[in-house]
Amino acid sequence: MQLLNQIEKEENLLIEKVKNTLFLAQEKVNCSIEVCVKKTIGISVNIRNSIVENVEFNNDSILFVTVYNKFSKGVSSSKDFSTNGIKKMLEIAIDISKHTSSDFFSGLPDAKFLCFKAQDLDLFYPSEFNIKNAINFASESEREAFKFDKRIINSEGSFFSNHITIKVFANSLGMLEQYKSTRYSNYNCMIAKDNSTMQRDFSYSTSRKLDDLEKPDVLGQKTATNAISRLGSKKINTIKCPVIFSKETSSIFFSHLIPAISGDNIYRKSTFLLYDLKKRIFPEWLNIEENPHIKKGLGSKPFDSEGVSTTIRSIIKNGILETWLLNTYNARKLGLTTTGHSGGISNWLVSNKNISFKELLKMMKTGLLITELMGQGVDIVSGNYSRGAVGFWIENGKIKYPVNEITISGNLKKMWNSILSISNDVNMYSNIQCGSTLLSEIQISGN
């Protein structure tokens, strides 16, 4: 109850600061104004080998103001919420707008797109910031991993965090809305050793509600299992073969679609999908729906960073690219309307074939299961893809041995079109919710 009262008090204070900032701005200059404040309160704990290495308490607030002065834009921010601090921040934003080139496409979103009543998306599940409990939570996953098998010989650390975020947004068109959210995360990374090799692996979970987080003992056991399974890893010969991205790496694999269809890259003509709107870029059976309004969703939000209402929409329908991801500015540059994507995507739901992961392995028969990706070798201009990978070699639908020190490469457009199936083991710890993904063939570089 004490925490709830504190949060309510903080929220009311932030609302008053935003109102005051808007009032002071409108006194100073006759132009369009946008004000946003974000406050994050929380704790995070890192432990390693039962020793507490780091405990952090966060209580950070930042106020942003954007001024549109006859199509010239000025942006400033401050952590000083005093009246003098706000006035100084406004003066800086106004001064910047006077020295910025006029851009006809700059300005607030049209009022019809704004969110004047933010819906409750069930994102707020606060719990007390108890450092002792946080340390115990992080310690238990490490302790369980050590107990699981004698081959677990060291720890790279365990982590737990508990954070509350309050966001208040207003503009000179009359919008004033706010919402609160919580996020809990735990992570554990362990090292396994046998006679000849050492390997590390990790597990993690994240949720809006503490009770929905992976239990620390289960997390530790998963980490130990993952690390042990990688012992005896070896490099394979260079080959072209079928590949399965695990559910975790599938979320990463589909994330490359985001910059490829973002408005900034479209109007700058710096994406390999520039001419593919309303064209098929995935198999006909594949759909990606964006739903910003999933209760307790990790990517859920009632409005974007410009105050535009978020909406449910098809990103990919029957394999066809249905939309760009647009904010107000790049939408106007393209002669289109905003899609509510200022600040990024919300929740993407990637369709699957409703088969189990085991059935997916049987479907592949022989090939590579990828469980971790390394490096940043993705070129959005060309679509060329090259990343380090580790995983397991599969024969007759069963895991034969672990694999490391390989590179997978191809072109994203061809890779997306080569998707044969997706299993129903959906990754719920990402805002891109996807199962494991089977591709017909990909280049693997090894020996």
Swiss-Prot record:
It comes from the Bacteria. It is found in: Cytoplasm. The keyword Protease applies. Its EC number is 3.4.-.-. Pfam families: PmbA_TldD_1st, PmbA_TldD_2nd, PmbA_TldD_3rd. Keywords: Cytoplasm, Hydrolase, Metalloprotease, Protease. Its main location: cytoplasm. One of its GO terms (biological process) is proteolysis. Transmembrane segments: none annotated. Gene3D superfamilies: PmbA/TldD superfamily. GO terms for cellular component: cytosol. One of its GO terms (molecular function) is metallopeptidase activity. PANTHER family: METALLOPROTEASE PMBA (PTHR43421:SF1). Probable metalloprotease. Belongs to the peptidase U62 family. This is Metalloprotease PmbA homolog. It comes from Buchnera aphidicola subsp. Schizaphis graminum (strain Sg). The lineage of its organism: Bacteria, Pseudomonadati, Pseudomonadota, Gammaproteobacteria, Enterobacterales. The gene is pmbA.
